[in-house]
Amino acid sequence: MNYTRHTYKAGNQNWNIRQHDNGWIYIANNKGLLEFDGVAWNTYPIRNAKTRALEIGSDNRIYIGGMGQFGYFCPSPLGGLDYTCLSDSLPSTVSVGIIWNILSDKNRICFQSDRRFFCLENGKISQIDVFSDIYSSLVVRNKFYMTSSKGLMILNGTEFIPVDNTSDIGSTVKTGGLLSYQDKLIVVSRDKGLFVYDGSVLRKYATAADDFCSRNQLFCAALK
């Protein structure tokens, strides 16, 4: 089933999609948060900012991020959804940038921007600076991973540290995505195909799509 922007009456770019426990679909769209209940579409703007990232937390809040801000939606007593901006609580000297991804475990929600993470835990927001461009990020079994020009990194306390034997990522391999498969990480490179990290060694993973991958720029991926 395909829906055009004339049907859902919002922007023509959709960046992220999630399905709520109730079956409703939520989408990060240029015009805001799209909601589809199977029959009707609704659009909820975030102060007219373009949205880029979306996640549904264990608390059933719909976390959203975009250009210069992040926050969450929750049901309104009058129907529909109400928006709360979390980034308003940051010091005026802090630049949010663009929120590209939102990660969650049972305790934290982390909003990933260009070079830092803003992590919400117990109602407080902390900031983790990476000091290099972040290419992709992922949570696997409550462990936070990300790739940057420094390689594959894992969150250790309040900082990201390099994962052993993955220095090729970042220095020669730019990533377009991270995927979890069984007990391994699949690294989707921009133009060099797939790599697999098994916990100790990073190796190239040959597929029938290698030629396609080398001739095109990959920016996202999913496992079915």
Each model region followed by its residue ranges:
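Carboxylate-rich, polar loop motifs that coordinate divalent cations or form catalytic acidic clusters
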Residues: 1-224
